[in-house]
């Protein structure tokens, strides 16, 4: 079979930079799915993307589908011929539909009888006759929330489309994509190189675009080039560029021919907290800030332009003029905000509604303050600092800086708290109260910070559930799922001795009569338990392990985590599968017992050697297990219990549990109940698969 390389390019207006990668990846996934469905073999496929183009390159694509034989089954032989052996009308109609006579049909014998069959040879379709429709279907399935129309065209896409190119080797594939006829014309850079040129071969795409059109179409190459050049530029001025991958991705999606330049700003702006300056540079201008070896912000920034200029100094000057007013704003806001303490802003929180039924932000910080102090008392943190940090926790939202640069909330609160003379614990808690802000973010570690972060999240969870606005489906306007994961992570990762029931009860009490949902506390607990399952699954923990622990309903997250780790370790032991099966068997036996389960073991009624051995082993282990359970050393406890395997196996091999003698039966049930209870101190091992 012959092969060729395929190139598909769609030339567009500037595509949304934050969607560029997703569009390209989806286009590739959709097209390769089409090729696979059509049984078209290929070696590999990659995507390219730049601000004004999406492209796919498929290597060693088969030039045609393979010929194949399709079995077309007809009527059963018993109904295909009449009593005289002549073909029935049904048989003749089937044969005619397949272009053969009944006599030319083959026979197929199955366990259900004999059938007429025609093995039709179907010739494969040439690839060039399939690609246009496949590419169109791939484009139709792109994740475009708001498609647009342009001109008089009824076609819709994320941006207007100007060119479409489909080449199979050197051959132009005829057809249309989004109403644009396929042609060899490829557009170059807007301001450099050839505005457009003819592409002779699919293999020339990257090199011709780069050399003739001044476009680097390979997204990853552009990204790597920007990163390398930015790092070199920063090193030249004795610093290190702050290159977050998300910003790097966005910048790479904005330029076709990246040129990295270095600019500066007045040193006087460094008196402003660096986070505000960085927010301005990165968020508004898409610049890379530069820091020295000590982590101090330098009065420089690195930016990427989309053109090779004969006068780069002019471009640098232009960017410096653009950023200067934003930095001046930050300086003005900071100096203005410093004239008022955070405490003096407390009354203004009364003017901001948190939620209609839950009151103002002032009401919320009062609740956070009380709950944070309650948590601090249980964890050994400074309760006075926790109460103070909770009270001030939202005051920075009323500052000019945070109103203008919203992502600096918490961070500016920390700086203002330090300027106000608050304790360092209070200042740090102002920033860390929002942690973890996103998946993979760190959690607060300082005691006061943990107390305030937990109080804030729990107040929101209990309050929103309390007014009957729990998340439904994908909708989660109050980000309760993130808050719940945050609560669990803070407690688990800091090994805090906190009980969810106690925390929820306290939070509910602080809401007073605001809550209309009488089941709020139970619903919040269930919601948190469900987040446990999702969180551990994301960490690769087996569902059966999670369910085994959930069955015991431990409400202390740190304790829950210890059980998860212990059961995960237990499952790696050789004895685990046999003991899990035995526990399942014990559970089934005990479930059939009517009334209360027997609990007292009478040694004189242990008549069989196997039950005597099991009882002796349990008696030997129990004094060793008790302190392990008390200290939550579940892993060591399960390791000891794994030593029961042989005794348990022998018991079920030799002993009839449901004996006719009632006393013997109850004694054996008590023995099994005791055995099961030892495991249930940790988890329901019977649920392990």
Curated annotation (Swiss-Prot):
GO biological process terms on file: arginyl-tRNA aminoacylation; glycyl-tRNA aminoacylation
GO molecular function terms noted in the UniProt entry: arginine-tRNA ligase activity; ATP binding; glycine-tRNA ligase activity
Catalytic function, reaction form: tRNA(Gly) + glycine + ATP = glycyl-tRNA(Gly) + AMP + diphosphate
Record keywords, A-Z: Aminoacyl-tRNA synthetase, ATP-binding, Cytoplasm, Ligase, Nucleotide-binding, Protein biosynthesis
Protein's UniProt keywords contain Hydrolase: no
GO terms under cellular component? cytosol
Q: Where in the cell is it found?
A: Cytoplasm
- EC assignment: 6.1.1.14
The protein's superkingdom reads Bacteria
Into which EC class is this enzyme placed? ligase
Quaternary data: Tetramer of two alpha and two beta subunits.
Matching NCBIfam families: glyS
Q: Which family does it belong to?
A: Belongs to the class-II aminoacyl-tRNA synthetase family.
Please state what the protein is called.
Answer: Glycine--tRNA ligase beta subunit
Which species does the entry assign this protein to?
Shewanella baltica (strain OS155 / ATCC BAA-1091)
Q: What is the lineage of its organism?
A: Bacteria, Pseudomonadati, Pseudomonadota, Gammaproteobacteria, Alteromonadales
């Amino acid at each position: 079979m012959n092969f060729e390389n395929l190139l598909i390019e769609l030339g567009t207006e500037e595509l949304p930079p934050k969607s560029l990668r997703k569009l390209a990846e989806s286009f590739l996934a959709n097209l390769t799915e089409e090729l696979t469905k059509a049984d078209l073999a290929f070696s590999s496929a990659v995507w390219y993307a730049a601000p004004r183009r999406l492209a796919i390159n498929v290597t060693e694509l088969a030039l045609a589908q393979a010929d194949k034989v399709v079995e077309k089954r007809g009527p059963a032989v018993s109904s295909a011929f009449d009593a005289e052996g002549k073909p029935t009308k049904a048989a003749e109609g089937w044969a005619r539909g397949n272009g053969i006579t009944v006599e030319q049909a083959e026979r197929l014998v199955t366990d259900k009888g004999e059938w007429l069959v025609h093995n039709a040879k179907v010739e494969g379709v040439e690839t060039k006759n399939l690609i246009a429709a496949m590419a169109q279907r791939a484009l139709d399935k792109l994740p475009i929330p708001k498609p647009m129309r342009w001109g008089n065209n009824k076609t819709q896409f994320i941006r207007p489309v100007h060119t479409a190119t489909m080449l199979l080797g050197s051959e132009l594939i005829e057809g249309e994509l989004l109403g644009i006829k396929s042609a060899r014309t490829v557009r170059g850079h807007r301001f450099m190189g050839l505005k457009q040129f003819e592409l002779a071969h699919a293999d020339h795409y990257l090199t011709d675009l780069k050399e003739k059109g001044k476009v680097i179409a390979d997204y990853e190459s552009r990204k790597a080039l920007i990163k390398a050049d930015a790092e070199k530029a920063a090193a030249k001025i004795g610093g290190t560029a702050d290159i977050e991958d998300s910003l790097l991705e966005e910048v790479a999606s904005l330029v076709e021919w990246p040129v990295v330049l270095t600019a500066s700003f007045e040193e006087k702006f460094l008196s402003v907290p660096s986070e505000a300056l960085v927010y301005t540079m990165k968020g508004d201008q898409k610049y890379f800030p530069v820091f020295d070896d000590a982590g101090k912000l330098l009065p420089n920034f690195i930016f990427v332009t989309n053109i090779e200029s004969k006068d780069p100094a002019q471009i640098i000057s232009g960017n410096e003029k653009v950023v200067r007013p934003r930095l001046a704003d930050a300086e003005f806001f900071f100096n203005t905000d410093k004239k008022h303490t955070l405490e003096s802003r407390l009354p203004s929180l009364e003017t901001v509604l948190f939620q209609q039924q839950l009151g103002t932000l002032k009401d919320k910080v009062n609740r956070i303050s009380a709950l944070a102090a309650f948590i601090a008392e249980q964890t050994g943190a400074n309760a006075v600092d926790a109460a103070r940090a909770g009270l001030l926790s939202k005051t920075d939202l009323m500052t000019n800086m945070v109103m203008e640069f919203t992502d600096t909330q918490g961070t500016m609160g920390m700086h203002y708290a330090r300027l106000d003379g608050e304790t360092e614990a209070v200042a740090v808690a102002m920033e860390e109260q929002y942690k973890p802000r996103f998946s993979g973010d760190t959690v607060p570690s300082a005691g006061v910070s943990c107390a305030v972060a937990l109080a804030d999240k729990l107040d929101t969870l209990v309050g929103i559930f309390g007014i009957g606005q729990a998340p439904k489906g994908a909708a989660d306007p109050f980000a309760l799922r993130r808050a719940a994961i945050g609560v669990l992570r803070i407690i688990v990762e800091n090994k805090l001795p906190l009980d969810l029931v106690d925390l929820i009860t306290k939070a509910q009490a602080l809401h007073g009569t605001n809550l209309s949902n009488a089941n709020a506390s139970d619903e919040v607990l269930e919601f948190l338990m469900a987040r446990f399952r999702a969180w551990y699954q994301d960490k690769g923990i087996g569902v059966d392990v999670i369910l085994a622990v959930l069955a015991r309903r431990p409400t202390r997250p740190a304790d829950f985590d210890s059980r998860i780790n212990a059961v995960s370790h237990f499952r790696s032991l050789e004895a685990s599968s046999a003991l899990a099966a035995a526990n399942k068997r014990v559970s089934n036996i005990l479930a059939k017992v009517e009334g209360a389960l027997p609990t007292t073991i009478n040694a004189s009624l242990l008549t069989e050697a196997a039950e005597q051995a099991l009882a002796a082993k349990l008696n030997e282990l129990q004094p060793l297990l008790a302190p392990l359970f008390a200290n939550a050393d579940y892993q060591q406890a399960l390791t000891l219990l794994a030593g029961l395997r042989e005794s348990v196996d022998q018991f079920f091999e030799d002993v009839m549990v449901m004996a006719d003698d009632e006393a013997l039966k109850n004694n054996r049930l008590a023995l099994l109940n005791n055995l099961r209870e030892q495991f249930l101190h940790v988890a329901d091992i019977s649920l392990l698969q």
